């Protein structure tokens, strides 16, 4: 670490990663993790004790994608860059297919670091693929290694087995055996594991043989509270809104209204990737089996970004097809909206505020939820929530008091919770106010970044190489790579 502060390298390999206008929901790999690493990078780069933050991801020169993903280096902010390294060719591929190409990514990253002549103080891997990459680089350069799992293989395997999926099918489709093996290795060598919740430490990492070896630090992510401001700000006569915000709101209302016979009803809102674990079908079933709920409120499901369902990946295609079939089964025409796309930068904050202004509710019925960032976003705008009782939402509801936890497999419980909030002015007002106030108290990126910087400085002060010449790789492979590259 120089006198100017920390140089932090983060790694997040899968999905579509760029600094602005994130394509969240475009596919199963471009979700909350992508948003997390971008927001974290921005927040860390603003810290006084941080000199530079680089986020490493894959270089993608694919005609099906924006040219943004083919920029070798993208400057997001003065002290924050996205660095794209080519591995496994130039085409986009889902994360399960990346494993054979990770060593290529490591080798090319070593070359990049040596060409830059600037050794990182910290390497931080997000998800097991990037965790493996960061672990190898930590060994090579003798620097501390931080890991954030975002989701874990053993927990996923347990859920898939419960759903009836055969183990050999899991291995073929998800490379689950390789993922768990790498996760066990990461737990042996990580200097620090950053998690979002205490439940993650206790229940998810507790499933691993090496789960007690690392140091853990619970650092919940934050949200941009200026972007997700309360819904009533727009109702005030002195409110000054940008043309971009006004356009986003008008476009969303126009899109929603074309689906609804009675558009002025309260709005039940769901926003997620088209993934089976998100349990969209469970929410539609809860709504479809409750005629009184249909009379009270409309349902809008924003399930990622889609064009032609038949051309999508199998998991996404199955989820969206099931969604359409459920809509038809329960005859929800005129009551349910299923828009094909939405803009996360401008439209999503407006979407929460539209639902809040209609005194609606946001629902996250996921079967498994490592954290639940959308719950924070909704709560911050004053939109009450109904959330799965699995994982991160437990901490969020405990800290914020902005809604009700439910068993995501119980459609009756989901319907009851929605009904309780929408039908009671007292409940709605209580949950709305709690969310607005408590998100701002407990969940900001500034708090996260300050605590992160303190942990990073502690790790660095414990001893590391300070320049390229002083590097002492942790193993023979590292010594060879430093010499050859």
Regions picked out by a protein language model, each given a short descriptive name:
Residues 1-485:
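Catalytic cores of nucleotide-sugar-dependent glycosyltransferases that transfer UDP/GDP/TDP-activated
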């Amino acid at each position: 670490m120089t006198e100017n502060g920390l140089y932090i390298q983060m790694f997040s390999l899968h999905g579509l990663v760029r600094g602005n206008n994130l394509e969240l929901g475009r596919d199963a790999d471009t979700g909350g993790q992508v948003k997390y690493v971008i927001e974290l990078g921005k927040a860390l780069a603003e810290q006084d004790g941080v000199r530079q933050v680089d986020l490493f991801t894959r270089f993608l020169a694919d005609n099906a994608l924006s040219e943004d993903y083919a920029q070798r280096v993208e400057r997001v902010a003065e002290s924050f860059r996205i660095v794209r390294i080519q591995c496994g060719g130039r085409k986009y591929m889902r994360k399960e297919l990346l494993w054979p190409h990770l060593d290529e990514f490591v080798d090319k990253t070593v070359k990049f670091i040596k060409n830059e002549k600037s050794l990182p103080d910290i390497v931080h891997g997000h998800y097991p693929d990037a965790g493996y990459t960061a672990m190898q680089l930590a060994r090579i350069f003798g620097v501390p290694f931080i890991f954030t799992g975002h989701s874990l293989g053993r927990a996923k395997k347990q859920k898939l087995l419960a759903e009836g999926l055969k183990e050999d099918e899991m291995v073929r489709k998800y490379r689950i055996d390789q993922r768990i093996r790498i996760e066990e290795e990461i737990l042996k060598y990580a200097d620090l594991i950053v998690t979002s919740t205490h439940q993650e430490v206790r229940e998810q990492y507790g499933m691993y043989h090496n789960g007690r070896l690392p140091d853990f630090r619970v650092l919940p992510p934050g949200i941009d509270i200026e972007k997700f401001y309360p819904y009533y700000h727009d109702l005030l006569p002195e409110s000054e809104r940008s043309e971009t915000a006004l356009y986003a709101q008008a476009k969303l209302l126009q899109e929603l209204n074309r689906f609804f016979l009675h558009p002025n009803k309260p709005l039940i809102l769901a926003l997620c990737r088209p993934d089976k674990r998100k349990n969209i079908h469970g929410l539609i079933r809860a709504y479809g089996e409750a005629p009184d709920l249909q009379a009270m409120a409309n349902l809008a499901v924003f399930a990622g970004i889609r064009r032609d369902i038949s051309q999508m990946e199998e998991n996404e295609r199955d989820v969206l097809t099931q969604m359409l079939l459920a809509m038809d089964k329960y005859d929800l025409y005129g009551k349910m909206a299923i828009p094909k796309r939405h803009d996360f930068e401008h439209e999503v904050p407006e979407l929460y505020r539209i639902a809040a202004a209609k005194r609606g509710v946001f629902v996250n019925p996921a079967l498994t939820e490592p954290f639940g960032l959308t719950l924070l976003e909704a709560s911050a705008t004053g939109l009450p929530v109904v959330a799965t009782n699995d994982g991160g939402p437990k901490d969020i509801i405990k800290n914020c008091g902005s809604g009700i936890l439910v068993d995501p497999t119980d459609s009756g419980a989901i319907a009851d919770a929605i009904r309780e909030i929408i039908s009671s002015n007292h409940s709605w007002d209580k949950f709305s106010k709690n969310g607005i106030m408590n998100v701002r108290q407990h969940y900001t990126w500034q708090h996260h970044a300050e605590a992160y910087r303190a942990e990073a400085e502690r790790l660095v002060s414990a001893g590391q190489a300070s320049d390229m010449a002083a590097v002492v790789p942790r193993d023979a492979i590292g010594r060879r790579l430093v010499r050859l590259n």
